[in-house]
């Protein structure tokens, strides 16, 4: 951050601001007003050059959901910005992917994914284009070796898959709040583990 723009602060030790992504010349940081399912959600938009807070974009009320809303902000392969919730039990409280209109903060739900077992999902990754309805949602399951994939075609869930990785580094599982990073359509990673689709 350049001198004079030291305005990036995170209250409550960052528990209200758990995700960020860069698109173009800007960095977007997810935010919620409190740690509750009814919290209001927002994105802080920062200049990628100076670190200056450009805008606090309030998001639509559709963001409010269990367990905590607006836990992360992510982008797809075409730089469409989406937010996701934190779910402690994806079998009863699905993880939702909401596409953000960066002009007015309105939200469009593009995916709602669930699991057959009680899995916690903190973060997901996207590959594809949510604007066309053709994309894939990836998640590494907390404290496990499981990776889940939900494939959407023309806006509808067409397939879901689970894979177990052989090993993880540096522990025996992915850990507390793992993130998946899609490298290309055939390779993704969570920390030090590289997985082939």
Where are these regions (language model features)?
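Beta-propeller fold detector
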Residues: 1-9, 53-61, 106-115, 157-170
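Short glycine/acidic-enriched loop and turn motifs that connect beta-strands
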Residues: 33-38, 87-92, 142-146
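Beta-propeller blade signature
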Residues: 40-51, 93-104, 149-152
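Repeated scaffold domains used in trafficking and secretory/extracellular systems
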Residues: 13-20, 62-76, 112-130, 167-186, ...
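Beta-strand-rich domains and repeat architectures in extracellular enzymes and scaffolds
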Residues: 4-38
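Blade-loop segments of beta-propeller domains
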Residues: 41-85
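Entry beta-strands of beta-propeller and related beta-repeat scaffolds
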Residues: 25-29, 79-83, 132-138, 186-197
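Loop-centered beta-sheet repeat module
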Residues: 126, 133-150
């Amino acid at each position: 951050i350049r001198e004079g723009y030291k305005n990036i602060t995170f209250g409550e030790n960052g528990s209200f601001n758990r995700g960020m992504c860069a698109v173009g010349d800007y960095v977007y940081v997810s935010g919620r007003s409190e740690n509750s399912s009814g919290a209001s959600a927002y994105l802080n938009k920062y200049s990628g050059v100076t670190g200056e807070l450009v805008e606090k974009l309030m998001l639509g009320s559709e963001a409010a959901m269990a367990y905590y809303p607006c836990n992360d902000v992510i982008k797809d392969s075409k730089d469409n910005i989406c937010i996701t919730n934190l779910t402690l039990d994806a079998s009863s409280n699905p993880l939702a992917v909401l596409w953000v209109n960066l002009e007015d903060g309105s939200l469009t739900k593009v995916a709602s994914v669930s699991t057959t077992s009680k899995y916690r999902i903190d973060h997901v990754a996207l590959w594809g284009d949510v604007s066309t309805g053709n994309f894939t949602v990836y998640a590494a399951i907390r404290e496990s070796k499981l990776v889940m994939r939900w494939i959407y075609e023309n806006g509808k869930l067409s397939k879901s898959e689970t894979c177990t990785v052989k090993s993880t580094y540096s522990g025996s599982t992915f850990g507390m709040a793992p993130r998946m990073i899609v490298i290309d359509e055939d390779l993704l990673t969570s920390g030090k583990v590289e997985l082939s689709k």
